[in-house]
Amino acid sequence: MKVIFNADDFGLTRGVNDGIVHAHLDGVVRSTTMMVGMPAEAHAVELANHLPELKVGLHLRFTAGRPLTEEQNLVGRDGDFTPYGQFWHRRDYDPIAIHNEAVAQVEYFLALGLNLSHIDSHHHAHTHPQFEPVIYDIARTYQVPLRSTGLAGEEEFGCRYHFTDHFYDKRVGHDSLIQHLLTLKEHYDVVEVMCHPAIVDTALEACSGYAKQRELELAILTSDELKLSLRKHDIEVTDYSELIFAPLHSCV
């Protein structure tokens, strides 16, 4: 089995960026997804330009910050995106507004000069029932993989692919992660593990309730123990290009 450790939130803060780079250079992270239009975006681009082996995708925003478009259907009275707590209860989203904002973010990303590796979203927003079909079509248009939460699978990628958010919050731990991967190994060719490594800074503490845990993630993702365990169990670290170039019926 192969595993993709994808680090979310690239571009959120400089501490997040530095943590992701550390997890890439000294750990198992080979893929990340960037939030455009966020405070540390320029810093993230500068870092990415010096890391040719780090695959960078787009972390679509629909629950954080302000949109790149003027689509009023996506925001509250303050002009910010609908907060996370309210986002999932809404069923009045306009698919045209969703499409326009998502395309604007993709085009903004491409204008930065980066190669688009794949697409996912902050807070899994693309899995909202009104967002899912729109974002899926956009991913197909740009011919890049979309983080799977049941929409795309073996027929889409040509292999048995599975996404897991197990490595998060109270479940962050070496033993828990390895045991989880071993249960998946019997059924899948490629598993994507969502992760959030970071070096906590004041900006992160101010904007996210998930802060200190990110440093624990970073410690595990860069540990010799994890690298040894993956080799012991014949689990190979890869990146999203594994899905792009997957031959029919097999990724191994």
Curated annotation (Swiss-Prot):
It holds the Pfam family YdjC. Its EC number is 3.5.1.-. Homodimer. GO terms for molecular function: deacetylase activity; hydrolase activity, acting on carbon-nitrogen (but not peptide) bonds, in linear amides; metal ion binding. One of its GO terms (biological process) is polysaccharide catabolic process. Belongs to the YdjC deacetylase family. This is Carbohydrate deacetylase. The keyword Metal-binding applies. Keywords: Carbohydrate metabolism, Hydrolase, Magnesium, Metal-binding. HAMAP family: COD. The keyword Metal-binding applies. The lineage of its organism: Bacteria, Pseudomonadati, Pseudomonadota, Gammaproteobacteria, Vibrionales. Mg(2+) binds at H59, H122. Probably catalyzes the deacetylation of acetylated carbohydrates an important step in the degradation of oligosaccharides. It is an enzyme of class 3 (hydrolase). Its cofactor is Mg(2+).
